[in-house]
Amino acid sequence: MTVFNKFARTFKSHWLLYLCVIVFGITNLVASSGAHMVQRLLFFVLTILVVKRISSLPLRLLVAAPFVLLTAADMSISLYSWCTFGTTFNDGFAISVLQSDPDEVVKMLGMYIPYLCAFAFLSLLFLAVIIKYDVSLPTKKVTGILLLIVISGSLFSACQFAYKDAKNKKAFSPYILASRFATYTPFFNLNYFALAAKEHQRLLSIANTVPYFQLSVRDTGIDTYVLIVGESVRVDNMSLYGYTRSTTPQVEAQRKQIKLFNQAISGAPYTALSVPLSLTADSVLSHDIHNYPDNIINMANQAGFQTFWLSSQSAFRQNGTAVTSIAMRAMETVYVRGFDELLLPHLSQALQQNTQQKKLIVLHLNGSHEPACSAYPQSSAVFQPQDDQDACYDNSIHYTDSLLGQVFELLKDRRASVMYFADHGLERDPTKKNVYFHGGREASQQAYHVPMFIWYSPVLGDGVDRTTENNIFSTAYNNYLINAWMGVTKPEQPQTLEEVIAHYKGDSRVVDANHDVFDYVMLRKEFTEDKQGNPTPEGQG
């Protein structure tokens, strides 16, 4: 019998096993990191061979279940990240997953259906291979010893890596050891969740840190500052910026009271990083969560302000997330469950509190977060059909505009000001099942270009700056902008809005979902253009 005939006979007998290996290999090479691919493939194959030689069916299933489910989940996550964002899964995505609340996950299930199907298919495929006891395969002793060698070698390499890391950082981290070991296994993406867990623990350790600032407090003539942070808002869908549909009539009606930023850009295309960049001393080029305690809430508290944080983003996992590490420093925090309009009664209550203190009231909106069709009451829809994704997204913008109009109404007779900006934009590709989505690797300008303006009450008269700002201004410098807006600054930073804008305008550096730094100006304008700025053929965006 020739070698080819032997191979053909073996392939015929074990074709399902070969199929599993091929699917695992291709998926990991294309949609995941190719790092340590040999070890991962050996780990995968040898584990299957060991399990297939367990004679007891209940025991075989008991051992197989966690292996099958974890491997299928890992591959499905890789496919989702690659197909949706054009990048491999990373610790930034892992942090976003860990910070997602159950309500948000349920709302977004429709976006995940193809990948849930992939998870089910892969689970069944791997289970179909493992479930059959096969005496024709090498014995457990042989495959078990080989698997033990692979695991031992991987663990040794991981320990070496963790030791070098501990030597450099003067501290051992079990998360680094776990993360490194995961890269040698079929559960590669667990390494990112280990890194995210490490970040979570670091954040917990510094969340209660309240630095002391040398402050300069200047009277701006404003008593009430309302900071509104929008979510996933595209400038291209706002009539305030020239969009054809009337999505922002309330803000446009206040145009004479507004200082508009035409080219505001977010520092990052996802909330977990973009909001801390905007509200703390953290920066695009020197990202470090130890910068988070240097934030607008702690500054306002020390300056004698009464501070409030009102959020319609779920209170789930309130401790140990980047945004909540800032929010928790406010004197009063409120989390509502439902639409953004539920924040208005709490805003009214905050305004009615009799105090001689100035007030900083932060409203963190759900805004236009995907799926946009769930971001507003159906009774508030003005664009049809309501199941069209473009109509839904425009309705979510219109709903936020309505809320802003109500905020202006509450503040029009007060010495008050409102600053509004969105945490980041969104990509748009009409050829995709989910037309709107977060920016990924080398995102387009649409993922960063955000609305931003400062509204001044008519009571303040003409003594405030309402001129339009046409230069690029990154919200990564909003920490300084907000400080100057409140009149609460440190000696080393610009003291007025004009000085902040003059100092930081034109800085167009941004970070993508892969933590790479890019010049916003050099990015393609739209997702449906290729990296050189040319339109992509229909259906290939």
UniProtKB/Swiss-Prot annotation:
| UniProt cross-references to SUPFAM superfamilies, sorted A to Z | Alkaline phosphatase-like (SSF53649)
Query: Do you know which InterPro entries this protein is assigned to?
Result: Alkaline_phosphatase_core_sf, PEA_transferase, Sulfatase_N
Q: What is its EC number?
A: 2.-.-.-
Q: Which UniProt keywords apply?
A: Cell inner membrane, Cell membrane, Membrane, Transferase, Transmembrane, Transmembrane helix
**Gene3D superfamilies from the UniProt entry:** Alkaline Phosphatase, subunit A
Cellular component terms (Gene Ontology): plasma membrane
The segments annotated as topological domain Cytoplasmic are: 82-110, 163-264
* Primary localisation category: membrane
Q: Indicate the transmembrane segments per the record.
A: 61-81, 111-131, 142-162, 265-285
Sum up the protein's function in the record's words: Probably does not transfer phosphoethanolamine to lipid A.
Name by which UniProt lists this protein: Putative transferase YhbX
